[in-house]
């Protein structure tokens, strides 16, 4: 009979990071391979959904870690409460807050009014209407999002391994 081994703090943090990094690898494939060859808005939507899952996984683990470190009294049950708790935890990190703002849009991406522009063309654009604004999500915007998420993952890793 095998005995279960307890995972050390560092090992658990690495497991969560592996899960987050796997999501990022899948998202990068959508951005740099699938979108390059198909140039459809469906790929953009799937990419945003993939990023949403990655940010969700990260924020859940960040909140669990913060609770263990007694930086927050409890983990909120609802998604809006979790977002608010994360905003308070990382209020000094501007990039982190930008990613959380992006996440709020990504959460609603499937229900938002969207317009597809230039599908199957070089300048494919998904026009999203969010909070009364018109947001054009094209390849340049996606690369900006990808850079922000890269920094977000780095911050997440530092926090989880602290």
Give each language-model segment a name:
Residues 1-44:
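Charged alpha-helical initiation segments
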Residues 36-75:
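N-terminal interaction modules that seed assembly of large macromolecular complexes
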Residues 69-150:
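Long, charged low-complexity segments
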Residues 27-38, 61, 65, 156-160:
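Secondary-structure edge/capping motif, primarily at the C-terminal ends of alpha-helices
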Residues 1-5, 40-52, 84-100:
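Charged, low-complexity, helix/coiled-coil-prone segments
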Residues 18-21, 25, 45-56, 97-100, ...:
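Generic structural signal for well-ordered, non-transmembrane alpha-helical segments
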Residues 5, 147-162:
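Charged phosphate-binding loop/patch that engages nucleotide di/tri-phosphates or the phosphate backbone
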Residues 64-68, 99-103, 158-162:
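Long amphipathic alpha-helical segments
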């Amino acid at each position: 009979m095998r005995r279960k081994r307890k995972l050390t703090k560092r090992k658990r943090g690495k497991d969560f990071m592996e899960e987050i990094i796997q999501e990022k690898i899948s998202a990068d494939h959508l951005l740099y391979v699938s979108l390059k060859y198909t140039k459809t808005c469906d790929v953009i939507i799937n990419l945003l959904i993939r990023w949403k899952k990655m940010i969700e996984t990260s924020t859940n683990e960040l909140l669990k870690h913060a609770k263990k470190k007694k930086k927050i009294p409890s983990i909120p049950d609802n998604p809006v409460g979790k977002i608010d708790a994360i905003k308070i935890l990382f209020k000094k990190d501007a990039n982190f807050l930008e990613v959380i703002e992006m996440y709020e849009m990504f959460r609603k991406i499937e229900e938002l009014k969207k317009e597809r522009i230039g599908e199957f063309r070089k300048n494919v654009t998904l026009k999203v209407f969010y909070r009364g604004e018109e947001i054009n999500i094209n390849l340049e915007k996606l690369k900006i999002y990808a850079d922000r998420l890269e920094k977000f993952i780095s911050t997440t890793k530092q926090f989880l391994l602290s």
